[in-house]
């Protein structure tokens, strides 16, 4: 993986983590949606694309009614949503995850039991940790086991293309980064 791809991994992980974590109408995401509609993701997406991933990129970057997307978000990820966002629901030990973060002096969070925090942690590690072992441990212990189950749920339950596309592209970037970590 080139240096550009690695840097883009951090950016994309942070973006995707926030898209899974925040309501689409959250003001924090306003600039992210503008950037997506300007095809910013296509400009930083360094992975090879096939027809399916091109369609997914387009689905994330098309102008969308944020209120409609907010309804989909509620249906999928709200407290009684169809997709469990809690990493503990996928067999991840939250206390072990919190300790992993503490050992690496990562910022404290109110609740670590959310899938999006795994993507945000991956981004933080990419930007702030020189430890290949830490990244490998994080992927093997926390991110990949949870992501496989969570993303499948999103793909199966989403009715709008946006979240199905987000799940597919998340899977692609994680697979590429996992392969890179395995090679090193």
Curated annotation (Swiss-Prot):
Single GO cellular component term: cytoplasm
Please indicate which superkingdom the organism of origin belongs to.
Bacteria
Q: Which SUPFAM superfamilies match?
A: TorD-like
Q: Tell me one GO biological process term.
A: protein maturation
Q: Which family does it belong to?
A: Belongs to the TorD/DmsD family.
Protein known as: Uncharacterized protein HI_1543
Q: What is the organism lineage in this UniProt record? A: Bacteria, Pseudomonadati, Pseudomonadota, Gammaproteobacteria, Pasteurellales
């Amino acid at each position: 993986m080139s240096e550009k791809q690695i840097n883009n991994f951090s950016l994309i992980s942070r973006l995707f983590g926030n898209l899974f974590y925040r309501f689409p109408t959250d003001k924090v995401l306003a600039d992210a949606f503008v950037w997506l509609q300007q095809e910013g993701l296509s400009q930083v997406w360094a992975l090879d694309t096939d027809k399916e991933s091109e369609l997914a990129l387009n689905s994330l970057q098309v102008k969308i009614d944020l209120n409609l997307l907010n309804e989909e978000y509620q249906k999928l990820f709200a407290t009684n949503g169809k997709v469990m966002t809690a990493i503990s629901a996928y067999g991840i030990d939250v206390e072990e995850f919190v300790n992993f973060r503490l050992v690496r002096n990562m910022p404290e969070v109110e609740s670590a039991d959310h899938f999006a925090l795994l993507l945000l942690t991956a981004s933080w590690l990419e930007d702030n940790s020189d430890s290949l072992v830490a990244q490998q441990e994080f992927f093997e212990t926390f991110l990949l086991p949870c992501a496989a189950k969570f993303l499948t749920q999103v793909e199966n339950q989403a009715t709008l293309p946006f979240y199905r596309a987000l799940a597919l592209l998340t899977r692609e970037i994680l697979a590429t980064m996992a392969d890179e970590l395995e090679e090193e």
